[in-house]
């Protein structure tokens, strides 16, 4: 129990209800049947449970520990970079060591070859513990999935290992300043150079985690229009634009022409900074075309279903966590504890004993 601004807050150590998770995975979805498939033949239910338990420990120790602090001390721009509270970097390192970013990928790719449903369940714990901090690895996984699905073999070789091991992080830049809804209105331009690379110029806004010091490099997936491309959605292409360029030998080169123009204020998820980025103030930011020209929206749409599921699961995780907080509060708190006139709050009945409170808790749980 803590007291803030004169109000009693009752905390809970539970992130999610483990019994509910077991019911969903093994009784409702019959996840164990996946073990009959050749791809998961080397796994077991014990491994699934151990994965979830390890994730729960990381969520409790490295994510939940700074949820309140990260809301009170959101990222700040120091004139060069966006700085976070120390716990954010510790959480990133912990989740990288856990292997969540690449857990679904095959052993050949360096992953854990876990079923998608187990990975999703693990992410529920992380989202419930601190959904803002969890956005860093979720966007990195989305970036890796785009490159894995549509990038060239050379692009996969250069970027995927570092994205999977947490050396690089990733973002997806879609919206532009003054363009909030229609991707077909994208004005960012891309010019082809003699060496086969592109130079892009323009602005992107609402880029979540567009700048930070958690990783050595940030890989931006950016939608732009190649010069001479058709108007509308059919003329948009997808590009890889790294914050730091990569030399042929794999070492870091010079900084790309990407400038942080603004760090936007947020109502929620404050530990994930929403940024405005400027690409190519001079010659243009160096970019690498993903897949075929003019297929950018098609490629991005392929990961949207997965993104929608992840966002929805995050909402479900927060709702479940909110219910646990409400339940714990009702069990420990009595109406007299909120009243300054009470001399002996410990002997009063708890809120959970109220029929109306039970009704509200049941309604909250059902949703």
Residue ranges and their predicted role:
Residues 307, 314-318, 322-327:
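Mobile "lid/hinge" segments at catalytic clefts and subdomain interfaces of large enzymes
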Residues 208, 245-261, 266, 273-307, ...:
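A glycine-rich, basic-preceded beta-loop-alpha segment at the flavin cofactor/substrate interface
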Residues 2-135, 158, 181:
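Amphipathic, small/basic residue-rich leader segments at the start of a protein or domain
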Residues 197, 201-255:
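A short core secondary-structure module
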Residues 79-93, 100-105, 171-192, 203-212:
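Flexible, glycine/threonine-enriched loop-and-boundary segments that flank and lead into catalytic domains
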Residues 139-140, 151-188, 192-196:
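Internal maturation/activation junctions in enzymes
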Residues 107-109, 113-151, 155, 163, ...:
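Long, K/E/R/D-enriched contiguous segments that form extended
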Residues 66-78, 135-139, 331-345:
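Short, glycine/acidic-rich hinge or "gate" loops at secondary-structure transitions
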